[in-house]
Amino acid sequence: MSAALSRDATLLAFDYGEKRIGVAVGNLLTRTARALVIVRNLNREHRFKAVGELIAEWKPDALVVGLPLHPDGAPHEMTQRAMRFGNQLNGRFNLPVNWVDERYSSVEARAGLRARGDAADRVDAEAARVILQQYLDGLPDHHEFN
């Protein structure tokens, strides 16, 4: 899915997991991302109510979802679940969704939290931050969101 975004567009990113969904927020102008919250993935109703509240609060222009893959790049069971989640986000909230290869994002998140002395229970939100920062870092200077 693609759409041109303004230079100061706000993005929400998600690290989808069976028990928890890490969420991060970022901005195209500053090209920075920060860990936001962790949504407990209790059931579909709870998941989308919580995400809907975040979307209402942050008013993102687009969403980024981490795509879990095996180290060799092959998809696995969680790949399909994350894709379904992203497609549901697009359908429910009518926002463009972009995918980011999230291999090793949790490893990087844990290392970053340890280095800063932050709580390990924030790893899912920090992984979402890593995913979003990877996305932002990969954008060309004259960006058209895609």
Swiss-Prot record:
EC number: 3.1.-.-
InterPro entries: RNaseH-like_sf, YqgF, YqgF/RNaseH-like_dom, YqgF/RNaseH-like_dom_sf
Broad enzyme group: hydrolase
Keyword terms of this UniProt record: Cytoplasm, Hydrolase, Nuclease, Ribosome biogenesis
Gene Ontology terms: cellular component: cytosol
Entry annotated with the keyword Amino-acid biosynthesis: no
GO molecular function, one term: nuclease activity
UniProt key word GTP-binding: no
SMART domains for this protein: YqgFc (SM00732)
Gene3D superfamilies, alphabetized: YqgF/RNase H-like domain
Compartment(s) of residence: Cytoplasm
Main location group: cytoplasm
Xref: SUPFAM superfamilies: Ribonuclease H-like
Any one of the GO BP annotations: rRNA 5'-end processing
UniProt function note: Could be a nuclease involved in processing of the 5'-end of pre-16S rRNA.
HAMAP family, alphabetized: Nuclease_YqgF (MF_00651)
Family in the record: Belongs to the YqgF nuclease family.
The protein, known as: Putative pre-16S rRNA nuclease
Organism, scientific name: Burkholderia pseudomallei (strain 668)
